Amino acid sequence: MNILFVRLSYIGDILHATAAARWIKQRYPNAILHWIVTPSMAELLEHNPYVDHIIPWERDVYEAHSKKLHLCTMWNMWWDLRKQLQPYQFDIAVDVQGRLITGLVLLATGAPIRLGLGGTKELNWLFTNYKSKNRSKHVIEQYLEVAQLLPMAIQQSSLKDRGTVETSNQDLLANDASETTRSDESFDDINQMDLFVTDEEQQQAQSEIAHIFTDKERPTIGIVLGSSWQTKSWPSEKWQQLIESMSYRSNFICFGGPKEEKDFTSLMQYVEKEELPVYNKLGKTTLREMAALLQACDVVVSCDTGALHMAIALNRPVVALFGPTNPAEWGPLTGLYRVIQNHDMDCLGCRKRKCPKGKAYCMSGIDPIWVKENIIELLDVVSSEVR
């Protein structure tokens, strides 16, 4: 049985979808699960035992042509994708992105069973024949609900009659399409995101950190600067206050991409000038190198951005700062975490990329003291567990 799992981008979204892919693979271990993904994100799926084959596709290139209405190029790209996917003879396609572009990917597969999210926009619903219903849950649970349509879809499909799907105890859930969880699975077991770091990558990260910091008894705090939305970011001066307030007892690693390397130049110059215990990795890591360094951190502090979800997937304790996005939908769901919001604001979760108030007070109003207190609390919890 060949399954195509569709979640093309981005970091957090792909990681949120890994629980659904694992759910499918654990219940259909003989199936071959392929995942189609934007090439720059493929690193996130490497060494994942629940993904048999990664199929890179230039989603960003297609979207760029779409915005300019380059219809001929779009058609050629889709036709090339169809020719690439057809030899796999997919039995099932699972779309947890719910966009027109992912609907077109489903169409290109020719799969008779096509699962997707309910209530989607951009005509995505035209391309799926089994749809989930509940869109009010955490996004991980939304994706799982799509995956959990599979037993029913298989039973109702002519695939079963053609004998192309095995119906052994391992493959179908005791022939009960309504059974979606195993009795031995906890909430965290089901909803945990997956990101796998190799032993070699982990050893390299630990060696790198040991070489940088002289005081190896101090905890290492990962701080993820910036976000894809300006409204989700915590101001630079707040990060500075946090670092200064804890520099006597902690080492810090700063994470971010090329954008953050530019945006936080002044902060990095300041911590270097003051000789604060900060390791600047802004714009200097691949996704996998970042993952290995995050895994070596004792606590990670972040706004709602990709590296936050990487840390959660790696089961690191996190302090998550939320403003315009809703943590009940996008925040930590498993592991050891604290979520901080500025509850003085009545517009939390507005999902606006530009604040109509002129400044994102939901984020700038988060006090570094609150963050420090939550970091210390998590460090104490981790310390007590070690003892």
Question: PLM features: residue spans?
Answer:
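Catalytic machinery of carbohydrate-active enzymes
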Residues: 1-387
